[in-house]
Swiss-Prot record:
Residues 1-20 form the signal peptide. It is found in: Secreted. Its main location: secreted. GO terms for molecular function: toxin activity. Has antibacterial activity. Residues 21-66 form the WAP domain. Disulfide bonds join 24-54, 32-58, 41-53, 42-80, 47-62. Expressed by the venom gland. One of its GO terms (biological process) is defense response to bacterium. The lineage of its organism: Eukaryota, Metazoa, Ecdysozoa, Arthropoda, Chelicerata. Belongs to the venom protein 11 family. 01 (wap-1) subfamily. This is U15-lycotoxin-Ls1g.
Length: 86
């Protein structure tokens, strides 16, 4: 009996961990002209209010996490600069 209760609790714990994952939202834009590409952020620390720095075809923008995968976190790095990327 105790092992069944333990198994159920373990399963519920694992399920809650999986369901609580958050991701960058999927971008609705598939392409962007080079002259319109800009980065508002390069890393999560550039964002405020619990938002993340997410990569889109038009640059990096601060977005609130979504429950479904599909988007991509910005890679950042030394070559990343904020502003327009010509």
């Amino acid at each position: 009996m105790n092992s069944k209760i333990f198994a159920v609790l373990l399963l519920l714990g694992l399920l809650s961990c999986v369901l609580s994952d958050q991701y960058c939202p999927k971008s609705s834009i598939t392409a962007c002209k080079k002259m319109n590409i800009r980065n508002d952020c390069c890393k999560d620390d550039d964002c405020t209010g619990g938002s993340w720095c997410c990569a889109t075809p038009c640059g990096n923008f601060c977005k609130y996490p979504a429950d479904r995968p599909g988007g991509k976190r910005a890679a950042g790095g030394k070559s990343c600069k904020t502003g327009y990327v010509y």
